[in-house]
């Protein structure tokens, strides 16, 4: 059993054969596209540092808020309302939050002196009543301030609500004060400490420089590396109004972006700060506008526990840290170069597109005859023929036909279904250019034979003379030398073919037909050229010479070996060859499919 694979099959190399076109226009297009691609690749390599191995940042954040605010508000004591002044420091307006966030209270609503007892519910929607039947004992509404007792009691002179067991008096639904009580909080400052680490590069740093002055304040232009921020400046950089946001509260994002170049020759690793609002700006359209929460201060009075409930409005600052650190890596550089080499194939794609477009049948028939400036583009047809080779699928229905009175070859790719091959139109294909180099190498006796008496020395064209039609020739014959086919009925239409499309002289009467196809010396020389030691008997010699004559005619009239394999010889030529090199029993098989 032969081996399925050998070292000769393994130790080999395959490459593509290319066509080189000497053209100034296409050469210019190629180099322009190459320069564009090279410029883009180089720019992207340097600007985006694609030669580096990137790693995301690992970060920790710590904040400290400083500032004092004086608050003036209405205070009720003994039924008398007067202005009260109070001082708020860091412990009063900041609250511990989880994650990279901190909160600054800017406004509040107090409910003082609450104690756990029974009292009427605040007259919100769904809490008002007219009798005890509207109140259900033990009912707990998520929107309620307590648990209903089942009684309907007066809330004021005009309204009644269900009695609840809760912190009384219940909290009233009040609007946040305008302007905000702690509107001076825009002058507060926050110190942000941000430590980052790139474990893959073993690099750690922070945003606070050793040379930083503790009295500096961040400014986008004058001091962009200072890590102390004024709250009002943060809102100004984000395009927001601190005074308006302070009334209902909101959420502000502080973005710290680290784009670190850790290469020793161009080291740079400093943060860049930016700010933007994260919550819904349209507080009037929001279902729950702003940002607020409740907390309580508990105390005892006459041994009774009481509390002051505070609804705090304020601004939550979320610190968002992101970025990458990059360092030169030879593997990343090789991968990038390898991935961009295919971009240079853009020139090939564009030039092939131009050649294919300007060599199309549409341009040949619809553009070039009417556009004089486009005539130089006809050279693309020549380039296309040199670049592309069309190969037909070797199907049993494929046949090629050549008429001596037509400059082209006809391709027939269909079932004949009893229809004579002579009348099938087929598709016109260009006749391949004949290569005479093989003939010139052979010492063939192709010199002119002596003229017979009365013979003219002028070349007589085959289409100039109309031969009389023989009475024995079939109806489809145009030269008068064809014979009816002897094949079975279902295959007979394949041999119903003449050498001419229109009436005229038969190709078998030409001198070249005799010298190339019927010359015994020429055919024997071709057989010996293939097998120098060939020795055959008379019958075998005739068979060899007959098939060689078939091949000589097909190669002569069709040029291409691919076409010659599927060429159908005219009846007149086929019978003339059989007459010269007959078979003993006189039975011939006809055309055989080569594959």
From Swiss-Prot:
The record lists the organism as: Mus musculus
Residues recorded as binding Na(+), renumbered to this chain, are: 342
Say if the entry is tagged with keyword Phosphoprotein. Answer: yes
Annotated keywords: ADP-ribosylation, ATP-binding, Cell membrane, Disulfide bond, Glycoprotein, GTP-binding, Ion channel, Ion transport, Ligand-gated ion channel, Lipoprotein, Membrane, Metal-binding, Nucleotide-binding, Palmitate, Phosphoprotein, Receptor, Sodium, Transmembrane, Transmembrane helix, Transport, Zinc
Tell me where it mainly resides.
membrane
- Per the entry's comment, what about the domains? Contains two P2RX7-specific cytoplasmic domains, the C-cysteines (C-cys) anchor and the cytoplasmic ballast. Palmitoylation of the cytoplasmic C-cys anchor prevents receptor desensitization. The cytoplasmic ballast contains a zinc ion complex and a guanosine nucleotide binding site.
Phylogenetic classification of the source organism: Eukaryota, Metazoa, Chordata, Craniata, Vertebrata
Region described as C-cys anchor: spans on this chain:
360-377
Transmembrane feature ranges: 23-46, 329-353
One GO molecular-function entry: purinergic nucleotide receptor activity
Protein name as it appears in the record:
P2X purinoceptor 7
Which residues does the record give as ATP binding sites?
A: 189, 294, 311
**Could you list which ranges are Extracellular topological domains?**
47-328
Cytoplasmic-side positions: 1-22, 354-595
Function according to Swiss-Prot or TrEMBL = ATP-gated nonselective transmembrane cation channel. Requires high millimolar-range concentrations of ATP to become activated. ATP binding trigers the rapid opening of the channel and allows Na(+) and Ca(2+) influx and K(+) efflux. Has also the ability to form a large pore in the cell membrane, allowing the passage of large cationic molecules. In microglia, may mediate NADPH transport across the plasma membrane. In immune cells, P2RX7 acts as a molecular sensor in pathological inflammatory states by detecting and responding to high local concentrations of extracellar ATP.
**Carbohydrate attachment sites?**
74, 187, 202, 213, 241
**Which compartment or compartments is the protein found in?**
Cell membrane
Question: For the region Cytoplasmic ballast, what residue ranges are annotated?
Answer: 395-595
């Amino acid at each position: 059993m032969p081996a399925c694979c050998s070292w000769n099959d393994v130790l080999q190399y395959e490459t593509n054969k290319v066509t080189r076109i000497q053209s100034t226009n296409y050469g210019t297009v190629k180099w322009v596209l190459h320069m564009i691609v090279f410029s883009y690749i180089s720019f992207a390599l340097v600007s985006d540092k694609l030669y580096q191995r990137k790693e995301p940042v690992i970060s920790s954040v710590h904040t400290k808020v400083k500032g004092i605010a004086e608050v003036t508000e209405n205070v009720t004591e003994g039924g008398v309302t007067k202005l009260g002044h109070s001082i708020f420091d860091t412990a009063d307006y900041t609250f511990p939050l989880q994650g990279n966030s901190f909160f600054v209270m800017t406004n509040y609503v107090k409910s003082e002196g609450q104690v756990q007892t029974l009292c009427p519910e605040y007259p919100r929607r769904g809490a008002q009543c007219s009798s005890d039947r509207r109140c259900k004992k033990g009912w707990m509404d998520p929107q309620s301030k307590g648990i209903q007792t089942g009684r309907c009691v007066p809330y004021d002179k005009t309204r009644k609500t269900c009695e609840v067991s809760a912190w009384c008096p219940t909290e009233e639904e009040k609007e946040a004060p305008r302007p905000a009580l702690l509107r001076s909080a825009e002058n507060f400052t926050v110190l942000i400490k941000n430590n980052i680490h790139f474990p893959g590069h073993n690099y750690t740093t922070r945003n606070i420089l050793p040379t930083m002055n503790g009295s500096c304040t961040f400014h986008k232009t004058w001091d962009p590396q200072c890590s102390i921020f004024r709250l009002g400046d943060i809102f100004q950089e984000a395009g927001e109004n601190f005074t308006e946001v302070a009334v209902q509260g909101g959420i502000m994002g502080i973005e710290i972006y680290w784009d670190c170049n850790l290469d020793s020759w161009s080291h740079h690793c400093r943060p860049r700060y930016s700010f933007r609002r994260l919550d819904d700006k349209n507080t009037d359209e929001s279902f729950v506008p702003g940002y607020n929460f409740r907390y309580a201060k508990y105390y005892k009075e006459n041994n009774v526990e009481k509390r002051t409930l505070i609804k705090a409005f304020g601004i939550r600052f979320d610190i968002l840290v992101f970025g990458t650190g990059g360092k030169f890596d030879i593997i990343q550089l090789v991968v990038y170069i390898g991935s961009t080499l295919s971009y240079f194939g853009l020139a090939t794609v564009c030039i092939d597109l131009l050649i294919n477009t300007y060599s199309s049948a549409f341009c040949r028939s619809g553009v070039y005859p009417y556009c004089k400036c486009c005539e130089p583009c006809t050279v693309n047809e020549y380039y296309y023929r040199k670049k592309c080779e069309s190969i037909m699928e070797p199907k049993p229905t494929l046949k090629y036909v050549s008429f001596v009175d037509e400059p082209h070859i006809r391709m027939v790719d269909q079932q004949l279904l009893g229809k004579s091959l002579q009348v099938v139109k087929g598709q016109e294909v260009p006749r391949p250019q004949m290569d005479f180099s093989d003939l010139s190498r052979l010492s063939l006796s192709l010199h002119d034979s002596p003229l017979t008496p009365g013979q003219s020395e002028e070349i007589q064209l085959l289409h100039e003379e109309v031969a009389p039609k023989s009475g024995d020739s079939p109806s489809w014959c145009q030269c008068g030398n064809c014979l009816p086919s002897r094949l079975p009925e279902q295959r007979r239409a394949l041999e119903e073919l003449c050498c001419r499309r229109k009436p005229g002289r038969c190709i078998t009467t030409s001198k070249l037909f005799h010298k190339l196809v019927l010359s015994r010396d020429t055919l024997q020389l071709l057989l010996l050229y293939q097998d120098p030691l060939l020795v055959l008997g008379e019958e075998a010699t005739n068979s060899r010479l007959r098939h060689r004559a078939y091949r000589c005619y097909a190669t002569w009239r069709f040029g291409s070996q691919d076409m010659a394999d599927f060429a159908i010889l005219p009846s007149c030529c086929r019978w003339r060859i059989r007459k010269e090199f007959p078979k003993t029993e006189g039975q011939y098989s006809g055309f055989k499919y080569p594959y």
